[in-house]
Amino acid sequence: MDRPQDPFNSRGIAVPPAVKMRNMAGNNSPWIDPLPPPMNARNGLANASLFSTSLPVLPHEKINFLDSARGTPLMDDASAKLKELDDDPEGKDYKFDFDLRQIDDLLPNEDDLFAGITNEIEPAGQTNSMEELEEFDVFGSGGGMELDTDPVESITAGLGNTSIADGLRGNGVNHFGPSNSASTVAGEHPYGEHPSRTLFVRNINSNVDDTELRSLFEQYGDIRTLYTATKHRGFVMISYFDIRAARGAMRGLQNKPLRRRKLDIHFSIPKENPSDKDLNQGTLVIFNLDPSVSNEEVRQIFGTYGEVKEIRETPNKKHHKFIEFYDVRAAEAALRSLNKSEIAGKRIKLEPSRPGGTRRNLMQQLGHDIDQDEPRSYRIPHVGSPIASSPPGAWAQYSSPTDNNLLQAFNASPTGNGMSPIGMPPSLISNAVKIAPIGKDSNWSKYDKVFSNNNQPHGAAFQHSHSYQDHKSEHMSSSPGTLTGPEFLWGSPKPYSEHAQSPIWRPPAIGHAIPSNTRSQGQGLLYGGRQASLFGSQDQLHHHHVGSAPSGAPFESHFGFLPESPETSYMNQVRFGNIGNIGSGRNGTGLMLNMAARASVNPVSALSGNMSDNNSSSFRPILSPRLGQSFYGNPTYQGPGSFGLDNSIERGRNRRVDSSVFQADSKKQYQLDLEKIRKGDDTRTTLMIKNIPNKYTSKMLLAAIDEFHKGTYDFFYLPIDFKNKCNVGYAFINMISPVHIVSFYQAFNGKKWEKFNSEKVASLAYARIQGRTALISHFQNSSLMNEDKRCRPILFHSNGPDAGNQEPFPINGICIHMPLEDGAIATGDPFGNEEDNNQNERTAGEEL
């Protein structure tokens, strides 16, 4: 079929509309420039020889520099095909080859046309993805060349748009630009795979025994739950108490063969609507906290219950803080002991933080951060802080668990600038073990010195997220004018410092060491307890847990205090420290914890200060077992090249051993010693009865006790699981006199229960809160007293004609009689925590 002749096509070829437009416009078109315009940094370089004196011209796979016929830059393959279109002598009909022949022929598309009309100066076309940015980056893979940019404004697009180059050091530059996603990384979850305490282990051989699985994973830490019901389907779920144990198991067992199958391990993200049992993910929310209380003071208070991972603040709510523990058991202990206690004159409230808060708030936090007006270096989140089932705080994600993508280009610029591409001091960048891909070899030894010997022209930036890092590397960067380690986190001088004259205490650098010669910026200490100079300081060794608060010795006073006897120090008002005391932050008066009877016993109270501060002759100083030979700043030298992943794991195992010993010692103080009781050396009276069958009611249990011990006790409490409407497996009883404990112990301890054919064996231990008065004080202000009367604690007359009979329980001066009835069912929380209602069986001393 013949087509009409196109007046603008002399050869009878079907010309695309865009070409017709150009022909109709002729040379007078305002959109056609007879001379090729120079190209800016976004669209390429018109004159590559501009950089010929400093860098060889690097060919780009999509740049053909000039078309000899037109003298016009050809930027991609589409333009090359259009060149063939104009020079084709055969006069083919391109109508049926339309998708192979691009039609814009160097004319801008519609967006470019409109952009050219409204703005004749700025180049048209805005890149909107990392892939397009890479096309225009001539130096992105050649020599690590970085253009001069402002270190603060270089993160205008937000940390979510940061790309860290993969490969060797110096082999990439960061790209910034609008991104169509918020920091998405490779992984099976929307925001990547977040470290959590629960591991989803796939590719499991169904013949593997549960004990074999437990022994394999238990070497990395105590296992909270082991779910193997789906083992026949090829996967199991393993949950740890400590998130560090989960991360260690992930790294140590990923792709390891088990019964000829390689394990495929992933982190399991907590449910959006968790059960009460899953609610505790190691993070507590502190409400009604006085804004004058610093993070260091909070760390000191809560650090007595376990190692603090980090403390986060909410920008708009200064009286709220989030405190995250490594171990969920520490969070439970702190929740039970400190909830509704008074700190700095205010009664605080503690609640467990619900999982999923980070995912829900990540986009909102990132957007909120970007919109702020203050310099962006003041909002840089801590790189090493993983997103781990905890609320507000936005973290950038820099690597995928499945990609070998270390932070290799962070400080690898050949220009010698110690600042990272996102304007972040290296001293605040986490170590290799926390940022290395999960399940891969870290290969960090090649890059470790990048963070150890760097010039740092900028001081440390303030962070809303105060993370206490793991001790994974023996050395971190430090230079005059940069607050690092304890200086930045605790506001104290370096407890363990070294001088340049003693290089033996650090492994030799690979190649030639780069001395630190940066001038001091003159920052002061943040609420330091003692003045210290920042001038001339060199690299330091951190012998506390870098990433957790220093255990037992956070400041200059490296002593803990251990009560020699369990006396009434349970209710002492404890003043924290003298030299590095808690109160030295703002007014130097010392922070008083007015917890009265709610204060808890701590086997090694991490309270820095003098023994006289506690006014107790039974306190004696002990050395922290974690400090070892490094107690006075002299670490154990491990030889050249001894840093890296292997030694970090070994140190982690050593810490776990220390922690196990510490926990064993902690449990000993709750064990009953009948000999001491007979001699009168141990005067405690409150006992915890463990391993009670869940179907037992208060009436049943009291009937068993009253058979031989009626009138020997004055307090009884059987906690109830309100969800399942049964007891939680333990109870508390206060004996009138310690002498009654011996017979009670002989009657119950190690004996099986008569009812329900239970296999459980009763066990006795001391409770944490001791004495009738302390128990009443603990419960009378609890929200439990507002719930069902049948689940409340019970008081008994201890003398007189009514001895052994119930007496009213005082609640805020009002006596309420509590009749004892069978089938105790309640809907409240026995310890005043409205959220955590599902109480599990716990070890001795953890509940009261």
UniProtKB/Swiss-Prot annotation:
UniProt keyword RNA-binding, yes or no: yes
Single GO biological process annotation from the record: positive regulation of meiotic nuclear division
GO molecular function per UniProt: RNA binding
Keyword field: Repeat, RNA-binding
InterPro entries for this protein: MEI2-like_RRM1, MEI2-like_RRM3, Mei2-like_Rrm_C, Nucleotide-bd_a/b_plait_sf, RBD_domain_sf, RRM_dom
Endpoints of the signal sequence: none
Keyword flag Hydrolase: no
Annotated region (Disordered), positions in chain: 370-400, 455-523, 826-848
Domain RRM, first and last residues per copy: 197-270, 282-355
Protein task: Probable RNA-binding protein that may play a role in growth regulation.
Descriptive protein name: Protein MEI2-like 2
Organism: Oryza sativa subsp. japonica
